């Protein structure tokens, strides 16, 4: 499949069956909701710019998995130059949207999970790396947006996951089957989950042997059965409903966060990238954090360019 256009991206999200709740009610049409639409427009820009010849060197790359042209947000970095182009792409998008364009966490998760799964397989002879490569090739082929999910609700932060009074404050495996696992819990503050086709789950802290059920990484579609999104709000959100052009902030672009709840969600074996290998949880968090700190050096600078009139 060729790179999607922005309009094709919008329609692909419209065709999904996501369970979205806001202000205590189910949102039947998230794509056209006036509060939520600006965040979708921000992601659309990552597709629109990839179609323009003058930006393709930054916005696209050659896949190491397929040899095909892919959106850079789905690319596995192969060189220092890839990292330079990544941060330049992020600055460009910050200049174009003056907002969060929501795909950085997924891209950084891609690269962290790619290398960590290789390390796990080397030690345990598992097939996580092959699982992830197949998933990544699928994402690239269909030009999908992926949400990277790391932050758990956590509860008492002085205690490990297995010590929490409520065992679901960290996302965990509650059942193991011959064909996969069942997970329960939530991921918090998920910018862009609403506008993503897939979600990659990662552990949020280093873990010990007693936390085996919590050391889990996998990917599922955002509209998988049992996933619910509860939209968090910002102070001026409802001003977009008042019909005025005053004090609505960035009217065209924006970001929106969700609490993503997993109510006994099934994950097939070929979508599992870690399951119980607790000593690798910290490695995955650390590698992700390194990539994501670099991302902030691109997107925030681009938004800063807008704020000082230099975009």
Predicted regions and their residues:
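Conserved structured core elements
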Residues: 30, 129, 133, 193, ...
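Glycine-rich beta->alpha junctions and the first turn(s) of the following alpha-helix
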Residues: 243-311
């Amino acid at each position: 499949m060729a790179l999607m256009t922005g309009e094709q991206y919008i329609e692909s999200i419209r065709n999904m069956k996501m369970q979205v709740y806001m202000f205590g009610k189910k949102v039947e049409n998230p794509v056209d909701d006036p509060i939520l639409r600006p965040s979708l427009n921000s992601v659309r820009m990552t597709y629109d710019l990839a179609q323009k010849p003058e930006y393709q060197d930054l916005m696209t790359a050659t896949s190491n998995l397929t040899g095909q042209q892919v959106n850079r947000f789905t690319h596995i970095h192969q060189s220092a130059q890839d990292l330079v182009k990544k941060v330049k792409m992020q600055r460009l998008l910050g200049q174009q949207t003056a907002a969060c364009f929501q795909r950085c966490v997924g891209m950084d998760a891609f690269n962290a999970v790619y290398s960590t799964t290789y390390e796990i397989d080397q030690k345990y002879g598992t097939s996580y790396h092959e699982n992830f490569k197949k998933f990544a090739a699928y994402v690239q082929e269909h030009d999908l947006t992926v949400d990277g999910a790391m932050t758990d609700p956590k509860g008492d932060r002085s205690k490990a996951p297995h010590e929490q009074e409520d065992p679901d404050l960290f996302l965990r495996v509650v059942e193991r089957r011959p064909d996969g696992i069942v997970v329960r819990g939530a991921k918090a503050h998920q910018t862009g989950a609403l506008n993503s086709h897939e979600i990659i789950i990662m552990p949020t802290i280093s873990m010990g042997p007693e936390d085996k059920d919590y050391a889990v990484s996998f990917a599922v579609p955002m509209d998988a059965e049992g996933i619910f999104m509860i939209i968090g709000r910002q102070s001026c959100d409802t001003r977009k409903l008042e019909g005025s052009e005053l004090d609505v902030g960035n009217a065209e672009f924006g970001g929106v966060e969700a609490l993503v709840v997993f109510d006994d969600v099934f994950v097939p074996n070929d979508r599992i990238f870690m399951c119980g290998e607790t000593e690798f949880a910290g490695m995955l968090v650390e590698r992700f954090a390194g990539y994501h700190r670099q991302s902030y050096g691109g997107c925030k600078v681009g938004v800063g360019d807008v704020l000082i009139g230099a975009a």
